[in-house]
Amino acid sequence: APRSMRRSSDCFGSRIDRIGAQSGMGCGRF
């Protein structure tokens, strides 16, 4: 699902690769 992650990449981008789900849950998930 690279399309779904591309939308959240607008907030952290490669940071999700270092933090993991914590970054996506604080920016694109919530």
UniProtKB/Swiss-Prot annotation:
GO terms for biological process: blood vessel diameter maintenance; cGMP biosynthetic process; receptor guanylyl cyclase signaling pathway. InterPro entries: Natr_peptide, Natr_peptide_CS. It is found in: Secreted. GO terms for molecular function: hormone activity. Pfam families: ANP. Residues 1-3 form a propeptide. SMART domains: NAT_PEP. Disulfide bonds join 11-27. Its main location: secreted. The record marks 3-4 as: Cleavage. Belongs to the natriuretic peptide family. Hormone playing a key role in cardiovascular homeostasis through regulation of natriuresis, diuresis, and vasodilation. Has a cGMP-stimulating activity. This is Natriuretic peptides A. It comes from Pelophylax ridibundus. The lineage of its organism: Eukaryota, Metazoa, Chordata, Craniata, Vertebrata.
